[in-house]
């Protein structure tokens, strides 16, 4: 039985929860989004067929350039004439990168698709000064070195990049420059102060940990005056968290992410010692599946289950829209993304259509209405540690709906 409380409208839904992520890894950017040699390439080297899909889905926000890649990325390598840009070794993915895609190209991509740019700075091998210079290059208005560097490239007006991430997954031993929560918070404080000195209007998103309440507490405690969000990442299937062959487990994933959101918010409240803190949660990397470069190439793996889970996770973010304002599906193109490309064109995978629907419908809503669902329950394995739950759902209705309670049988 499904009950819809049409009077009970809650929480404005941020369009940025329907955002996406791209990284210098495999064919997420090169050979797909950016491919000057493609017959689909425009004058700037971007594939027009991919741009069209990004515009169709009304992509609201793009996070770049990583990801693990960013922890050894130096933004100045990707500036200036392409033939003069250095080819570097990427420690994260054990590959070479020729830096053909850089800051200016990324800004052009956002302009072409209408997406809000979200840049993540290097807190692995990078410095606070380097990050501050990047902000100056993008947003500087004075007669200064890095603002003038942008002007020399033909961009008199600043890029007005509002959102900046303070490193990527710095808690993980797979990360270049990994550190403890205390070390990260201290280092991030220096980065945040330097970047805010350059442009006080920017919003900073600190590195959080989906399974690390102590980490999130410490980050919130130290950085509370300077950050707007704490970012957490989650890939449900593929890292021994959920088993793809267990249908009931998989259908629990959206509720599991809601619980992770609540735990992260509780850590932020505790760390700031402020129940009314404005610091939000950003799910700026998420996918139903982990990155598995061989398995992900098989488009037969993307089925109705992916569609249902993707929709369920987006519903989780909508239900938590008082806390969650940013989310980035990771990645959008290739690997386990919503679309796949090859030399002949673009394939829209099953989960793509969820984003096309949700971004067009929910971004027009002032909020969502309360619903309650009652039905059969089922037990989950001890590894998940929740059982006999009752499902809850949220639906967007026309704001002009009459005030009423609607009851219906759900099959």
Question: What would you call each of these model-derived segments?
Answer:
Residues 237, 254, 258:
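Active-site-proximal helices and loops of the catalytic beta/alpha 8
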